[in-house]
């Protein structure tokens, strides 16, 4: 599934490089790894930050991909 979705960052631990996004459509929270963040700067997210992303099947279930801050 590569449809773009929007959501808010629930939490993100910059030291460990991962967190979760709460999709705007009310679906289950989605895991996000820092490597999925599209940025030329330090790849981190802030709590309650608005993002656009797609969902791909990761090793442990659905994971955010191509994450862009809005």
From Swiss-Prot:
Pfam families reported in the protein's UniProt record: CSD (PF00313)
User: What GO CC terms are in its UniProt record?
Assistant: cytosol
| Induction cue | In response to low temperature.
One GO BP on record is: response to cold
| Major subcellular site | cytoplasm
Whether Metal-binding counts among this entry's keywords is: no
- Molecular function terms in GO for this entry? DNA binding; nucleic acid binding
Keywords for the protein's UniProt record, in alphabetical order: Activator, Cytoplasm, DNA-binding, Stress response, Transcription, Transcription regulation
Q: Where in the cell is it found?
A: Cytoplasm
Give every CSD domain span. Answer: 7-67
The reply on keyword Cytoplasm is yes
Signal peptide, first to last residue = none
NCBIfam families according to UniProt: PRK09890.1, PRK10354.1
Q: What is this protein called?
A: Cold shock-like protein CspG
State the organism named in the record: Escherichia coli (strain K12)
Organism lineage = Bacteria, Pseudomonadati, Pseudomonadota, Gammaproteobacteria, Enterobacterales
**Gene name of this polypeptide:** cspG
């Amino acid at each position: 599934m590569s449809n773009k979705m929007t959501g808010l960052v629930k939490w993100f631990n910059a030291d460990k490089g991962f967190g979760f996004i709460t999709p705007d459509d009310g679906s289950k929270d989605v895991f996000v790894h820092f490597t999925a963040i599209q940025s030329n700067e330090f790849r981190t997210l802030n709590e309650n930050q608005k993002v656009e992303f797609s969902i791909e099947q990761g090793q442990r279930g659905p994971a955010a991909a191509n994450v862009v801050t809005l």
